[in-house]
Regions:
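C-terminal alpha-helical interaction appendages
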Residues: 1-60
């Protein structure tokens, strides 16, 4: 399994898969040059971490 797959399975189990995909779209829209040549798994991981970070802040 690839890293992207593992992250997406984890996001699915946590119920945040849709939010991760939305965050991926937002990241690519914000800075297309930065994410143009970046590995998809790295973008997924960054999006997952962003969503988890927001979720943790909301819980505090």
């Amino acid at each position: 399994m690839s890293t992207a797959e593992d992250i997406l399975y984890q996001a699915y189990n946590e119920g945040i898969r849709a939010e991760v995909f939305i965050e991926v779209q937002n990241l690519r829209k914000e800075d297309p040059k930065k994410y143009k040549y970046k590995e998809f798994a790295d973008i997924i991981e960054e999006a997952y971490n962003n969503v988890k970070g927001r979720e943790n802040k909301k819980d505090e």
